Amino acid sequence: MTYFVLFLGLCFVLGGLAVASNPSPYYGVVGLVLASVAGCAWLLSLGVSFVSLVLFMVYLGGMLVVFVYSVSLAADPFPEAWGDWRVVGYGMGFVAVLVMGMVVGGFECWDLGVVTVDSVGMFSVRLDFGGVAMFYSCGVGMFLVAGWGLLLTLFVVLELVRGLTRGAIRAV
C-alpha cells in the first residue's frame, strides 16, 4: 500500500509538471486531469473520502471549463508537443530545481512514512468528517472569498485569452 501511495504522489507531481510546462492548452488539460485524479486517489487511499470527492468535482467541474474555453479560443492548427526541445528543457529545469531543493533541504522527509487518517489512535469521529463540519460551520466566509476569487480568476483568464479580438461580441 505504501508503494501505491508513493506512486500516486509521483503521478501528482508529474501531472503538476505537465501543467507547468505545457506548450499548448491541449496538453495542459491532460496534465490537470492526471494531477487531479492522482491527488484525489491519493486522498482516497489515505481514507479522506469526502474531501477527495469534493476536490475531484471542483477540479474537473471548474478548472476544465476554463481550459475548454481557452482551448476553443486559442485554436492552433499545429500545437507544440511535449517532445519539443524547449518543453523538454523546461521539464529538465523543473526536475533540477526539485533535486536541488531535496539536496539543500536535506532528506529528513524520507523518515516520515505514510500515515492514514485513523492510524494514530482511537478516534470517535474520522478526520475527514470533522472537516465536513468545519466546511459548513466556520468555513462559510472562506467559501464566499474562494468563490469570489474563482470568479475573478475566470474573468482574468477570459480577458487574457481573448487578446486583441472581441471574442463573441465581434461584428458579423
Curated annotation (Swiss-Prot):
Organism field: Uria lomvia
One GO cellular component assignment for this chain's record is: mitochondrial membrane
Annotated transmembrane regions: 1-21, 27-47, 48-68, 87-107, 138-158
**Catalytic activity annotated for this protein?**
a ubiquinone + NADH + 5 H(+)(in) = a ubiquinol + NAD(+) + 4 H(+)(out)
List localization entries: Mitochondrion membrane
Q: Which PANTHER family match?
A: NADH UBIQUINONE OXIDOREDUCTASE SUBUNIT ND6, NADH-UBIQUINONE OXIDOREDUCTASE CHAIN 6
Q: What class of enzyme is it?
A: translocase
Task: Write the record's keywords in alphabetical order, separated by commas.
Answer: Electron transport, Membrane, Mitochondrion, NAD, Respiratory chain, Translocase, Transmembrane, Transmembrane helix, Transport, Ubiquinone
Bilayer disposition of the protein: Multi-pass membrane protein
Could you give a GO molecular-function term held by this entry? NADH dehydrogenase (ubiquinone) activity
Keyword Lipid metabolism part of the UniProt annotation? no
- What's this protein's function? Core subunit of the mitochondrial membrane respiratory chain NADH dehydrogenase (Complex I) that is believed to belong to the minimal assembly required for catalysis. Complex I functions in the transfer of electrons from NADH to the respiratory chain. The immediate electron acceptor for the enzyme is believed to be ubiquinone.
Q: Give the superkingdom in one word.
A: Eukaryota
Task: Return the similarity comment.
Answer: Belongs to the complex I subunit 6 family.
What protein am I looking at? Answer: NADH-ubiquinone oxidoreductase chain 6
Could you say which EC number(s) this protein's record lists?
A: 7.1.1.2
